[in-house]
Amino acid sequence: MKTAIREARPEDIPQIQTVRNSVKENMLSDPALVTDADCKEFLFERGKGWVCEIESQIVGFSIVDLKENNIWALFMHPDFENLGIGRKLHDIMLDWYFEQTQKDVWLGTDPGTRAETFYRKSGWLEAGTHGNEIKFEMTFNNWKNRR
């Protein structure tokens, strides 16, 4: 199975939405809450995104928001979890982010999920809450020391 990770393009948005709405954890209460226009704004105006393709199908993606210093999204299609793809998308995204700025980056995720475990293992530090989610932060120095 050949995987290819590349920068996201506008034509990827429908498949990005499919992946986002296929997840079993951190599900949107209403899929209409995240529009194609939102995806476009975060991908091309506020930050940058990456996708992983297998046989022309997007199976995962990551998006970082430079304006709010936030990981806006990191999602894998459930059929392609536990293959190391999420880790690669995460690392490419953070490498790029910290090439742009040395400001701390943060994210929120639901407690008791595999995502929580993933971020803890990846060196993210718990920094309180964001709504009902756990807020995690990564500093420039923590990231560079992990590389």
Feature map (PLM): residue ranges:
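Glycine-rich acyl-CoA binding loop
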Residues: 52, 82-90
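Conserved acyl-CoA
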Residues: 88-104
